[in-house]
C-alpha cells in the first residue's frame, strides 16, 4: 500500500501540482532562484525556513525569537508543578505557521484565571495517545529537470514514525531544574512538537513529538541539500546539511542512521573532504565480517556462487578456483565440505586468492591459506593454495597464475562485490575480462549490488543511493545482535560516503544493475548460465535463519538470482561462460 503525502511541500500554502506522464502527482520543490521568487510572492517569507516547511516572514523573525524566549521561560517556570494544566484537546492546526503556533503554546502555558479546569473524565481520556499508522520511506522519485519531487511512503512494520510519547524523566532531570536552551543554529528545532497534553498518570507530563512530520521534512531537506550541491549553491547546501542533523535526532531506527550517514557524506562533498583510505583493507575486512553475521546478503552471495561452482566441478578430478575477492576466505569452507561429500570422492582443490595490500604490509592472504589448510586436513581433501597481492584486478596477468591445461585442471573464476571497482579506470574492466578469457574457465560467478550508482548526474546518483541504502538499513533492524548491526551500519556508511562524497579515482563504489552488467559481459564475449532451481530453493531456506525470512525475497531474473528486502532487489548473483564465438587473445 502506497500513500502520497501532499503536504510535503516546503510552503504551508496549498502547493502547485503537476501531473507526471504515468499519472503520479509531483510536488513542486523548486530551485534556489524559484525559492527567492516564491518568497517575494509570499510576502517576504524567510527562504531557509520556507524550504523546510515553516511559514515565517523575514520581518517577523525578531517577534518569533521573542516568543521563543517567552515560551522557554514559561516552560521552565512550570517544571515544578508539571504541565498538567494544559488542555489535552487543544489542536494546533498549522504548526508550520511558527508565529501563531508559538502564540497558542504561550497562551496555553499561561491560561487566564477564568478558564474552567478540565473535567476529571476528560483527564482520564487517553485516546490521544493511540498509535498512529506505521510507515517508512522505501521509495523516492526525483526529477531535477521538472524541478519536482514525489515522496512516496510504503507501509512497513520495521520502522516507526508514530507520535512518540516521552515522559518527563526523559526531558527533565529529576535532580536538577535545568533551563531549556534552544539551538543556536535554529531556534525552532526545540519546538518540533505537534501537541502537548497531560493525563492523571504517574508519568506526567507527556510531550508528543511528531516524528513523522519531522521525517518528511528530513527527507525533503536531504533532497534539497543534494540539489543545492549539484547547483553549486554551497551556502544553501551548508545550511541545509546542518538542518538535516537536527531533524535526524527526532527519528528512530533506520531512518535516523541513514540520514546521519548521508548528512556526513554531503558535508564531505560540500567541504571537499574525501574519506581517507577508501581501500583500507583491514578495516573493511573487520566490518565485512560483522555484515556477514548480521544479515543474509553475503551468505546468499557465497551460497549461490558455491552452488554454481559445485555443479561446474561435477565429475572433475582436479579443480582450480581463482578468487578475485579473497578477503578472509569465508566463502570456501562450505564448498570444500560439499566437495568432500561427493559420492565419487573429493577432487584435488587448488585455490588462488587475490586481494589488495594490507596497510601494515602484513601477509594476511597467507594467514587465510593456513587456516583453510587446517580445515582440509580434517576432511581429507588434497589442497593447494597461493595468494596474490594486487592494487587492482587490472594489474593481473594470466601468466602469473600458473594455469594448467584444461584437460588436466578445470578452472572457475569467482568475484563477489569486486568488478564494480574497476569502472573507475577507463578500459580496466575490458582488460580483466580479456585475462579471464585466457584462463578458459568452466564458469565465472559474479555477485554485485543491484543498484545504479554510476550515473553522470549527481542528483540521480544521490536519489538512487538514498533509496538503496534506506532499504538496506531497514532490513538490518531485524538483526538480533546489536554489535554486529552497529558495525554493519558502519560498513554500509563507508560505502555511502564514497558514493556521495567522492569522484574520479577516489570513488570505488561504482555500482551497476544486472542489466548493465549483462550488456558489459556479453559485449566482452561471455554468455549467461542459468542458475539451477536447487540454488533457488536452498537460498530460500537460508533466509529462514534470519527472522523466519520475513521481509527477505529471493527472485529469479533471467537465470540470475536476486536477494532483496520486500519488493526491492539489493544484490544479484549471476554465472557466465565463454561464448561460442569468443576470441581469446594472448599477450
Swiss-Prot record:
It is found in: Nucleus. A motif (LXXLL motif) lies at residues 419-423. Residues 1-23 are annotated as: Disordered. Residues 288-353 are annotated as: VHIID. Keywords: Gibberellin signaling pathway, Nucleus, Phosphoprotein, Repressor, Transcription, Transcription regulation, Ubl conjugation. InterPro entries: DELLA_N_sf, TF_DELLA_N, TF_GRAS. Residues 209-577 form the GRAS domain. Residues 367-399 are annotated as: Leucine repeat II (LRII). GO terms for cellular component: nucleus. Residues 411-498 are annotated as: PFYRE. PROSITE patterns: GRAS. A motif (VHIID) lies at residues 319-323. Its main location: nucleus. Phosphorylated. Ubiquitinated. Upon GA application it is ubiquitinated, leading to its subsequent degradation. GO terms for biological process: gibberellic acid mediated signaling pathway. Residues 501-577 are annotated as: SAW. Pfam families: DELLA (PF12041), GRAS (PF03514). A motif (DELLA motif) lies at residues 46-50. Residues 216-270 are annotated as: Leucine repeat I (LRI). Probable transcriptional regulator that acts as a repressor of the gibberellin (GA) signaling pathway. Probably acts by participating in large multiprotein complexes that represses transcription of GA-inducible genes. Upon GA application, it is degraded by the proteasome, allowing the GA signaling pathway. Belongs to the GRAS family. DELLA subfamily. The DELLA motif is required for its GA-induced degradation. This is DELLA protein GAIP-B. It comes from Cucurbita maxima.
Amino acid at each position: 500500500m502506497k500513500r502520497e503525502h501532499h503536504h510535503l511541500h516546503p510552503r504551508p500554502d496549498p502547493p502547485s501540482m503537476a501531473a507526471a506522464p504515468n499519472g503520479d502527482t509531483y510536488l513542486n520543490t523548486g530551485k534556489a532562484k524559484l525559492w527567492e521568487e516564491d518568497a517575494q510572492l509570499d510576502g517576504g517569507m524567510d527562504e531557509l525556513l520556507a524550504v523546510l516547511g515553516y511559514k515565517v516572514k523575514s520581518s517577523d523573525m525578531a517577534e518569533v525569537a521573542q516568543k521563543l524566549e517567552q515560551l522557554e521561560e514559561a516552560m521552565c517556570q512550570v517544571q515544578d508543578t508539571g504541565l498538567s494544566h494544559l488542555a489535552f484537546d487543544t489542536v494546533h492546526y498549522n504548526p508550520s505557521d511558527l508565529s501563531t503556533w508559538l502564540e497558542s503554546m504561550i497562551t496555553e502555558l499561561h491560561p487566564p484565571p477564568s478558564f474552567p479546569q478540565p473535567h476529571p473524565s476528560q483527564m482520564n481520556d487517553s485516546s490521544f495517545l493511540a498509535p498512529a499508522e506505521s510507515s517508512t520511506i522505501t521509495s523516492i522519485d526525483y526529477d531535477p529537470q521538472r524541478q519536482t519531487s514525489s515522496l512516496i511512503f510504503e507501509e512497513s512494520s520495521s520502522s516507526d514514525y508514530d507520535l512518540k510519547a516521552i515522559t518527563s524523566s526523559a526531558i527533565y532531570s529529576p535532580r536538577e531544574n535545568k533551563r531549556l536552551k534552544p539551538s543556536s543554529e535554529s531556534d525552532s528545532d526545540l519546538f518540533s512538537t505537534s501537541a502537548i497534553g497531560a493525563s492523571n498518570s504517574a508519568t506526567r507530563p507527556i510531550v508528543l513529538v511528531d516524528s513523522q512530520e519531522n521525517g518528511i521534512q528530513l527527507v525533503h531537506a536531504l533532497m534539497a541539500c543534494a540539489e543545492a550541491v549539484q547547483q553549486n549553491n554551497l551556502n544553501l547546501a551548508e545550511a541545509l546539511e546542518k538542518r538535516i542533523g537536527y531533524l535526524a535526532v527526532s527519528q528512530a531506527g533506520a531512518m535516523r542512521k541513514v540520514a546521519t550517514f548521508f548528512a556526513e557524506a554531503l558535508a564531505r562533498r560540500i567541504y571537499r573532504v574525501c574519506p581517507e583510505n577508501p581501500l583500507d583493507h583491514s578495516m573493511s575486512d573487520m566490518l565485512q565480517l560483522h555484515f556477514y553475521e548480521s544479515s543474509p546478503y553475503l551468505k546468499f552471495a557465497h551460497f549461490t556462487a558455491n552452488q554454481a561452482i559445485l555443479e561446474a566441478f561435477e565429475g572433475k578430478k582436479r579443480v582450480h578456483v581463482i578468487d578475485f575477492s579473497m578477503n578472509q576466505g569465508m566463502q570456501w569452507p562450505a564448498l570444500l565440505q560439499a566437495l568432500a561429500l561427493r559420492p565419487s570422492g573429493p577432487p584435488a582443490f587448488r585455490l588462488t586468492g587475490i586481494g589488495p595490500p594490507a596497510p601494515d604490509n602484513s601477509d594476511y592472504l597467507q594467514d587465510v591459506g593456513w587456516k583453510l589448510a587446517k580445515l582440509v586436513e580434517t576432511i581429507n581433501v588434497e589442497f593447494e593454495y597461493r595468494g596474490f597481492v594486487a592494487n587492482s584486478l587490472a594489474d593481473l596477468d594470466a601468466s602469473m597464475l600458473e594455469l594448467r591445461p584444461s584437460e588436466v585442471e578445470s578452472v572457475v573464476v569467482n568475484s563477489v562485490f569486486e568488478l564494480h571497482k574497476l569502472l573507475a579506470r577507463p578500459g580496466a574492466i575490458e582488460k580483466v575480462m580479456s585475462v579471464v578469457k585466457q584462463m578458459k574457465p568452466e564458469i565465472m560467478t559474479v555477485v554485485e549490488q543491484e543498484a545504479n550508482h554510476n550515473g553522470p548526474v549527481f542528483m540521480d546518483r544521490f536519489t538512487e543511493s538514498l533509496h538503496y541504502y534506506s532499504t538496506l538499513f531497514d532490513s538490518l533492524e531485524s538483526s538480533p545482535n546489536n554489535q554486529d548491526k552497529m558495525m554493519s551500519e558502519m560498513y554500509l556508511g563507508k560505502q555511502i560516503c564514497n558514493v556521495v562524497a567522492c569522484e574520479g579515482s577516489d570513488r570505488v563504489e561504482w555500482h551497476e544493475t544486472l542489466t548493465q552488467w549483462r550488456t558489459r559481459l556479453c559485449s566482452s564475449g561471455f554468455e549467461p548460465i542459468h542458475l539451477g532451481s536447487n540454488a533457488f530453493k536452498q537460498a530460500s531456506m537460508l533466509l529462514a535463519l534470519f527472522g523466519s525470512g520475513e521481509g527477505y525475497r529471493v527472485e529469479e531474473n533471467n537465470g540470475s538470482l536476486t536477494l532483496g528486502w520486500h519488493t526491492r532487489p539489493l544484490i544479484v548473483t549471476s554465472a557466465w561462460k565463454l561464448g561460442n564465438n569468443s576470441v581469446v587473445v594472448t599477450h
